[in-house]
Amino acid sequence: MAKEKFERTKPHVNVGTIGHVDHGKTTLTAAIATVLAAKFGGAAKKYDEIDAAPEEKARGITINTAHVEYETANRHYAHVDCPGHADYVKNMITGAAQMDGAILVCSAADGPMPQTREHILLARQVGVPYIIVFLNKCDMVDDAELLELVEMEVRELLSKYEFPGDDTPIIKGSAKLALEGDKGELGEVAIMNLADALDTYIPTPERAVDGTFLMPVEDVFSISGRGTVVTGRIERGVIKVGEEIEIVGIRPTVKTTCTGVEMFRKLLDQGQAGDNVGLLLRGTKREDVERGQVLCKPGSIKPHTHFTGEVYILSKDEGGRHTPFFNNYRPQFYFRTTDVTGSIELPADKEMVMPGDNVSITVKLIAPIAMEEGLRFAIREGGRTVGAGVVAKILD
């Protein structure tokens, strides 16, 4: 049979399963794909196909991730599931799998466990905006009061990490029953309830092209008689000829006007997210712009030097450091297109960070970078990547 052409008529949303080991994340992933494939078309996935997740590299870090696609009545979903806890940590921090929302799987028989808490904290730190809970293995709990207790515990845990615990949809079911074809409340019905929650609780994400204009500077040229051209890939939004823009980061912010957009040596009247373009800037000298700055819509993004971040430090096997680092460690932080030196302050209870650890840190950079919460960065030493991180909170 010929492979069906992928019709993207429905809006696209990225989700993933998170939660403690053996609470049923992969079984649920298989159950969702199987139940929804039968109803809306698509490929059913077996547990083993998902569990044998292939290795991929993101920012030089090896991560095992399984990708599954499925459709609901209203949307197309891309869903990530990781086999091991370390893979989740790496995935969420590097943004290899950007999630518009997460499905937290928690066993009704066990209640919240250490990784349940850690994944909720990670989701908060890396900016996963929405969490839906699937209370799994409900077929193993016959005491309604116990179910209520577990639900309460999960809601409290979500609230503790600044998610709206009281308003979070919690679906009770059994991924195993659903995967076995059970049509009851805990089986297929629960999966359809989960699909409804995904459709209604997670808003459709803004497309990159609808965002405010932002382009990291990759290169700067001077063209005699025409002025200064800055090249890069537009990260989000649209830039039209004649629009005023700001140059932000490293130096004091300045305003300029875009007088031309070039792509593949052709002149255009606008450039948009995803385009590799050259922008001609009026009255800007070549030495006024450098790699590592960004061009953006005036007032939309500010330069900062001080922030907290969640970082993963590569293990020795991943080509990272062989030794731990301590407070006031000063590596380079690679943001978008350039390195900036910064010093790391560790949490009070942490004396050192070992290769392979993840940790919350406070960073002070020596030069300001155009920064927003959720921005990803690499930590480097002499051009070699030793860690990956994400901006959790801007301090000033």
UniProtKB/Swiss-Prot annotation:
Give the keywords, sorted. Cytoplasm, Elongation factor, GTP-binding, Hydrolase, Magnesium, Metal-binding, Nucleotide-binding, Protein biosynthesis
**Per the record, what are the reactions this protein catalyses?**
GTP + H2O = GDP + phosphate + H(+)
- Protein species of origin: Cupriavidus pinatubonensis (strain JMP 134 / LMG 1197) (Cupriavidus necator (strain JMP 134))
| Pfam families to which the protein is assigned, alphabetical | GTP_EFTU, GTP_EFTU_D2, GTP_EFTU_D3
Positions of the UniProt region annotated as G5: 174-176
Q: Where is this region: G4?
A: 136-139
User: Which amino acid positions bind GTP, per UniProt?
Assistant: 19-26, 81-85, 136-139
Q: Can you name a GO cellular component term?
A: cytoplasm
Segment G3: which positions?
81-84
Which residue ranges are recorded for the region named G2?
A: 60-64
Q: Where does this protein hold Mg(2+)?
A: 26
> Where in this chain does the record put each tr-type G domain?
10-206
Q: According to its UniProt entry, what is the function of this protein? A: GTP hydrolase that promotes the GTP-dependent binding of aminoacyl-tRNA to the A-site of ribosomes during protein biosynthesis.
Assigned EC number: 3.6.5.3
How does it associate, per the subunit comment?
Monomer.
Annotated GO molecular function terms are:
GTP binding; GTPase activity; guanosine tetraphosphate binding; translation elongation factor activity
Instruction: Tell me where it resides.
Output: Cytoplasm
Region of interest called G1, as start-end residue ranges on this chain = 19-26
Just give the chief location class: cytoplasm
The entry's family comment says:
Belongs to the TRAFAC class translation factor GTPase superfamily. Classic translation factor GTPase family. EF-Tu/EF-1A subfamily.
Source superkingdom: Bacteria
**Protein name, entry field:** Elongation factor Tu
EC supergroup of this enzyme: hydrolase
